[in-house]
Amino acid sequence: PNQEAKAIIIAIHGRDSRGFEWIYPLQTIDNELTKTYFFRWDTTKCPQKIIPNLLKEILAMKDIEKITVLGHSYGGIVSSLLLNEIEGIETEIHVIAAPLASSDLKKYCGYIHPITKNNNVSYFQWRTIKKLDNAFNSLDYDPQLINFKESSVFLLPNQYKGKRLGHLWSISWVADNINLD
């Protein structure tokens, strides 16, 4: 990455991920104007527990003018917890196929999606079609559905490059279609 870059991209993986699903998306969105980071975290822990460490890493970066966070699945939960944490820097938070209304996370971790966001933060939800998403299609509800007025919501199509657009392919589709300018 360019050492003088004023913009950063932070990718945050989901549960039980080794990160392979991020190779194509990060190659697609990485450019000479940004520094790109992949944040690894222990997904056996509640997402709230890693926010102080992630925030410390972000705030330690100097002269940053724009932050773009891309969180997939449980990584989207982590990303959502930054909505009220980053101040004074233009920030985009993109949650991709994220179980923001997960009853399990609420039950075991006390997770509740934030109800507000800072004014410098733009929030984007990229939702898969539940019946095509093997992480969600066995549930009796769609864990992606939350009511957050200050967000832009996009429903992904049913196919990507001729294949079913499910949970993991959602990151690649977003990488091909996102506008990071």
Which role does the model predict for each range below?
Residues 17, 76, 171:
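Alpha-helical and His/Cys-centered functional microenvironments
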Residues 9, 35-36, 62-64, 82, ...:
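Generic preference for hydrophobic/aromatic residues in regular secondary structure cores
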Residues 9, 29, 41-44, 48-134:
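Serine-dependent carboxylesterase/thioesterase catalytic core
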